[in-house]
A protein has these predicted regions:
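Conserved N-terminal Rossmann-fold NAD(P)-binding element of oxidoreductases
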Residues: 33-35, 58
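Hydrophobic/small residue at the entry helix of a nucleotide-binding pocket
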Residues: 39-40
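A structured beta-alpha segment of the ubiquitous adenosine-cofactor-binding alpha/beta core
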Residues: 80, 84-121, 125-134
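Oxidoreductase and adenylate-handling cofactor-binding alpha/beta cores
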Residues: 165, 224-241
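A conserved mid-domain beta-alpha-beta active-site/ligand-binding segment of alpha/beta enzyme cores
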Residues: 170-224
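ADP-ribose/adenylate-binding Rossmann-like module
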Residues: 121-164
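Glycine-rich phosphate-binding loop and adjoining beta1-alpha1-beta2 segment
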Residues: 54-95
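Phosphate-binding loop/pocket of nucleotide- and phosphate-handling active sites
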Residues: 1-17, 236-294
Length: 294
């Protein structure tokens, strides 16, 4: 049996938590998502089910078996397939009326302006170690007055930061500048989750390898990220509810059953953050030494 798609019917169960007129607003919003792997893919599908009608999506990578533990599009049938092709197809299966602009080469300095054209909100789905393009993307969002959300899968939970127009920027919060990638990685971890709820239950620290750009991950964390990020997106796009911008942050850890709200004026320049970074450098040096990297 062939079914005819109807937007109102497809997203009718949103109504109640979302007003009918708000659903129409969401239908005409455009969200940019860079990276369609661990969090990016599930961000796209979750926001599709919220009824967002337009997306700019970017990813240059292909699915591999190492993606099976967490990535929405990773299956036996998609091994070797382009992530952007798989996720675009899945999104169009949810809403065939999507206004979908695809960037199969990923986001680069040369296409960044096109990627952010007509965008109402940017949701970060980039790989943790994609420092250069992440830095450029968030800077471009700040310049254009585009709100941006980063939701990081940490342990078995999520850490979320909102960067809103006219408020603290990504660079002001993390303080990356021209620092080496290893220092950017440390500042990213410490800045994303100042409460550090996840630190006590990592059972095999040797699996954290910043030098080889490999860290452990869980599907639960990615799913939680998508739920929180989509809720923040709803509030930002509809202009209702409380949206706390950086230097405010939020970390929810399902393993511990704990929620922490943080406030770090100055971002990583805050005294508590400076102490955490100093301790982190010592721990990172010891870890890299144990792994034979230094």
């Amino acid at each position: 049996m062939q079914y005819l798609f109807n937007y109102g019917d497809a997203f009718a169960r949103n109504i109640g938590w979302v007003a009918s007129f708000e659903q129409e607003i969401l239908r005409h919003k455009r969200i940019a998502i860079a990276g369609l792997g661990g969090v990016g893919g599930i961000h796209l599908l979750t926001l599709c089910r919220l009824g967002i009608g337009k997306f700019n999506i970017a990813d240059f990578d292909e699915f591999a078996i190492q993606n099976f533990n967490r990535q929405a599009g990773a299956t036996l049938s998609t091994l070797g397939a382009k992530k952007i092709d798989v996720m675009a197809a899945q999104a169009l299966e949810i809403n065939p009326e999507l206004g979908l602009r695809q960037f199969p080469a990923g986001v680069t300095s040369s296409n960044l302006s096109d990627f952010l054209r007509d965008v109402d909100l940017y949701v970060d789905g980039l790989d943790f170690f994609a420092f250069d393009i992440r830095q450029k993307l968030f800077a471009a969002c700040a310049e254009r007055g585009i709100p941006a959300i980063t939701a990081a899968p940490i342990g078995m939970g999520a850490a979320v930061l909102n960067f809103l127009p006219g408020r603290m920027t990504f660079e002001e919060y993390f303080g990356w500048g021209d620092l080496p990638d290893i220092e950017k990685a440390l500042r990213f971890v410490v800045g994303l989750a100042p409460a550090g709820l996840n630190r006590g239950y990592l059972v095999d620290p040797s699996r954290v390898n910043f030098a080889s750009r490999r860290t452990p991950s869980t599907a639960m964390a990615c799913q939680i990220c998508a739920g929180i990020a989509a809720t923040e997106a709803l509030k930002i796009l509809l202009g209702r509810g409380s949206v706390r911008p950086a230097p405010h942050g939020l970390q929810f850890d399902a393993y511990l059953g704990r929620l922490a709200r943080t406030w770090r004026p100055g971002g990583n320049r805050h005294p508590i953050q400076k102490l955490a970074l100093a301790i982190g450098r010592i721990q990172m040096k010891a870890m890299m030494s144990a792994q034979g990297q230094i």
